[in-house]
Amino acid sequence: MIVPVRCFTCGKVIGDKYYEFKRRVEAGEDPEKVLDDLGLERYCCRRMLLSHVELIDDIMHYRVY
């Protein structure tokens, strides 16, 4: 839903890297190389970016009571 600020497993800050990752992957770069360039070497941090699904724009259409 919302981009996680920290890795759920190890606690490393990853929120600042998400939009760079997303931009470069959408431009056609290999996700493995992008994650390496961003300094994400642990598989727990890598999965946080690889498995993230952006749903906040879809959910914002509904009212909260």
UniProtKB/Swiss-Prot annotation:
Binds 1 zinc ion. SUPFAM superfamilies: RNA polymerase subunit RPB10. Zn(2+) binds at C7, C10, C44, C45. Its main location: cytoplasm. The keyword Zinc applies. GO terms for cellular component: cytoplasm; DNA-directed RNA polymerase complex. The keyword Nucleotidyltransferase applies. Keywords: Cytoplasm, DNA-directed RNA polymerase, Metal-binding, Nucleotidyltransferase, Transcription, Transferase, Zinc. Pfam families: RNA_pol_N. InterPro entries: RNA_pol_su_RPB10, RNA_pol_suN_Zn-BS, RPABC5/Rpb10. Disulfide bonds: none annotated. Gene3D superfamilies: Homeodomain-like. It is found in: Cytoplasm. GO terms for molecular function: DNA binding; DNA-directed RNA polymerase activity; zinc ion binding. Its cofactor is Zn(2+). Its EC number is 2.7.7.6. One of its GO terms (biological process) is DNA-templated transcription. NCBIfam families: PRK04016.1 (NF003089). Part of the RNA polymerase complex. DNA-dependent RNA polymerase (RNAP) catalyzes the transcription of DNA into RNA using the four ribonucleoside triphosphates as substrates. This is DNA-directed RNA polymerase subunit Rpo10. It comes from Pyrococcus furiosus (strain ATCC 43587 / DSM 3638 / JCM 8422 / Vc1). The lineage of its organism: Archaea, Methanobacteriati, Methanobacteriota, Thermococci, Thermococcales.
